Amino acid sequence: MDTFITRNFQTTIIQKAKNTMAEFMEDPELQPAMLFNICVHLEVCYVISDMNFLDEEGKAYTALEGQGKEQNLRPQYEVIEGMPRNIAWMVQRSLAQEHGIETPKYLADLFDYKTKRFIEVGITKGLADDYFWKKKEKLGNSMELMIFSYNQDYSLSNESSLDEEGKGRVLSRLTELQAELSLKNLWQVLIGEEDIEKGIDFKLGQTISRLRDISVPAGFSNFEGMRSYIDNIDPKGAIERNLARMSPLVSVTPKKLKWEDLRPIGPHIYNHELPEVPYNAFLLMSDELGLANMTEGKSKKPKTLAKECLEKYSTLRDQTDPILIMKSEKANENFLWKLWRDCVNTISNEETSNELQKTNYAKWATGDGLTYQKIMKEVAIDDETMCQEEPKIPNKCRVAAWVQTEMNLLSTLTSKRALDLPEIGPDVAPVEHVGSERRKYFVNEINYCKASTVMMKYVLFHTSLLNESNASMGKYKVIPITNRVNEKGESFDMLYGLAVKGQSHLRGDTDVVTVVTFEFSSTDPRVDSGKWPKYTVFRIGSLFVSGREKSVYLYCRVNGTNKIQMKWGMEARRCLLQSMQQMEAIVEQESSIQGYDMTKACFKEDRVNSPKTFSIGTQEGKLVKGSFGKALRVIFTKCLMHYVFGNAQLEGFSAESRRLLLLIQALKDRKGPWVFDLEGMYSGIEECISNNPWVIQSAYWFNEWLGFEKEGSKVLESVDEIMDE
């Protein structure tokens, strides 16, 4: 931790933090976590101060706005934090006296010359709101509060006291520090600022003690027994000792690997007796239908946006006599339709709230009251009918054509642009010119890719869902599924459907909240009925598109998600980073061969090189070539699909199949790899190929690729034989 602090903070900040600890008789050597917290706190205070200025008339400027006017500007905030305590108190009393305000009972961190208010700054590992109210209870209204969390949220008593750029700088720095700490395995040992405050010792009562004893993991009878086991366990050398005991029983015979030893993975994916893998993404992707409404580009509340879109398509909004096209196994179509009508009425009314009434059909859809009942261990032991539920093993499925179709459609170009990326400043160093050029080419390809529209829809929806889940835990809320796209210079609000959030008392990260989705589509589910067993589908009307009448369907599904999945959904834009890194690796490789920057040559062409082409798929058993831009869109779409269908099966498949890929690469490089228990490795891979659409499709593509590689190896062997002769 000491090395980490030295490397990540300025010397002056570290010295001030150490001086602060010395005043309280604390030793930085013994308490590095406290030193880190003080350094972070100090740095945040300086970031806030360095970003905001006032001129002689008291007008506020940010650092960017004040460029060229530095002579007439002074800091808006006086930093009190970091001063010796006696000097800090003197400064605080002087400022209060000078500006005619009451001196706070506690020492502040900052003083705002504009509002003439003292400010307390707080940093927390938990929720910003929780720490805010903890501080508020202690300080009252004696000073303003600015609370920032490593979880990327904040809470300000005065929202106008800090602009968006200032908030962004602070949160970005906290995220950076958290990532660095996690990398060094220091994050878990770090104590939050709020945890340093002293607690209260109390004796455990009988009820709490009993609850503690029945909460221990299986295999332990009570808490004291578990604590005794942990205190006496010796983890050092345990693995080595067990391996030594097993060694006489293990017989390993290495074998040199040949191309003939490799076989396709997951043979069951070709078994036509198995059902096709169903669509199980959280939202519709290529089958989505957005109700478009032209807008001026101003920000709107989601309810206002949805209301305007529904008003434009009133025939769909007012439909009361739908046609049931398809029904999922456990669905109650009448309840689902009633819930949809309630959603439409909630959005269409004049009230600002989007809260839904807790009707019996809403309770059915959200699973209200259907949670498992917890029973004491003593009762369960005495009752012979009580037993552990058998684990549910996923059913095996075969490959489905719709996955490849989704891939093809999502990687195509459209006329709509939905990608929302922040602006970056002008280039300074020569390397930044290269980066900007590559970014320009990359964004031009990705901007109008269908996958980027779907990605932004996921980002916006999961952001709204997480906000509503935290803000309205006990309420049912209607959440519009929206996006904003730009087409030929015009902005359009898009409404893809509505969702209903159930009760969301999410204490743990894996606690589930029920979400019922209602999404518009022009795809008739009967065309590929094997794709939609999880959906109940109604036909709710038709629209005229380019002079042709198209039926509009409402796809309904009862689903669930948790905090972890919602947070990943908010960060789905990370797919851009991964695809851009792969693009840059290809460009760098080409540039190193040619001896100069090949960015333009890869995307278009230059005076010497024609544009690059890459294998992007197969058609009728032959490889299909595509441009560099097309290959980039395919990579980006694959990254998105990896996020959308990500689960334990995909994680396991990726990890296990990586070993097989390394063996194939070694064969291609003619390194003569040796293996043992090859069939065991295949078994580990195939265990993960069950009912995840992306895993099954990846296995299908892998088998195709393996076939091509085997054919190529035969050609090379024939060439070698001719050369030997």
Curated annotation (Swiss-Prot):
Belongs to the influenza viruses PA family. Mn(2+) 1 binds at H41, D109, E120, V121. It is found in: Host cytoplasm; Host nucleus. Binds 2 manganese ions per subunit. Gene3D superfamilies: Influenza RNA-dependent RNA polymerase subunit PA, endonuclease domain (3.40.91.90). It comes from Influenza B virus (strain B/Singapore/222/1979). One of its GO terms (biological process) is viral RNA genome replication. The lineage of its organism: Viruses, Riboviria, Orthornavirae, Negarnaviricota, Polyploviricotina. Phosphorylated on serines and threonines by host kinases, including human casein kinase II. Mn(2+) 2 binds at E81, D109. Plays an essential role in viral RNA transcription and replication by forming the heterotrimeric polymerase complex together with PB1 and PB2 subunits. The complex transcribes viral mRNAs by using a unique mechanism called cap-snatching. It consists in the hijacking and cleavage of host capped pre-mRNAs. These short capped RNAs are then used as primers for viral mRNAs. The PB2 subunit is responsible for the binding of the 5' cap of cellular pre-mRNAs which are subsequently cleaved after 10-13 nucleotides by the PA subunit that carries the endonuclease activity. A motif (Nuclear localization signal 2 (NLS2)) lies at residues 183-244. InterPro entries: INFV_PA, PA/PA-X, PA/PA-X_sf. Pfam families: Flu_PA (PF00603). GO terms for molecular function: endonuclease activity; metal ion binding; RNA binding. Its cofactor is Mn(2+). This is Polymerase acidic protein. It comes from the Viruses.
